[in-house]
Regions:
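Active-site and donor-binding regions of nucleotide-sugar-utilizing enzymes
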Residues: 3-176
């Protein structure tokens, strides 16, 4: 049986992940899921190791006040993912959390494939991140067509799937037509 760990860090990521996972579940019944998610993934019957609300902070002061809690959650999340030993870690948005976790998972178990949905806006700011992302991401799913050229140039394997709010037409292979 294949295993996928779904990693989200905020409600919008939970919503997007649930849309992708619901499509996968209609095509494949031989996949075991585990997550850090919220209500949308739970509605699909996917167990979560903790609710993403435990790591969702908006204000900078909230992040500072909870810095050590967040670091502990990152460590605990990595350990739970490694214990689950998925074939794929599917991380969604929230790059400051999900990509930190993904990097640590890849360092500890390079066999786990890491697919990230919603590219960080490295083409707009903090461009140096893309070089680090190439070290641990196996594939990235893109919202905007112009991102494809950028990530192709950076030699990061990618697929343009489109923006869920702009276009709901995604085929069974998660490629926008």
């Amino acid at each position: 049986m294949k295993k996928i760990f779904v990693l989200t860090g905020e409600p919008s990521g939970d919503k997007l992940a649930s849309e992708v996972i619901s499509q996968i579940k209609t095509k494949r019944t031989d996949i075991e899921f585990l997550s850090v998610g919220g209500a949308n993934l739970e509605k699909l019957g996917i167990k979560t190791i903790y609710d993403q609300k435990e790591i969702t902070y908006i204000a900078f002061t909230d992040i500072l006040l909870n810095f050590f809690k967040i670091k502990r959650k990152i460590k605990d999340t990595v350990n739970e993912i490694l214990k689950f030993n998925p074939d794929i870690l599917f991380s969604v948005d929230s790059p400051d959390f999900t990509l930190r976790v993904a990097k640590l998972v890849k360092e500890k178990n390079p066999k786990i494939k890491i697919i990230h949905f919603i590219a960080p806006k490295v083409w707009a700011w903090r461009e140096g991140r893309v070089k680090k992302m190439k070290e641990f991401l196996d594939h990235i799913l893109l919202l905007f067509k112009f991102e494809k050229e950028y990530f192709d140039k950076e030699k990061l394997t990618n697929t343009f799937v489109g923006h869920p709010l702009l276009d709901k037409k995604i085929n069974k292979n998660f490629v926008r037509k």
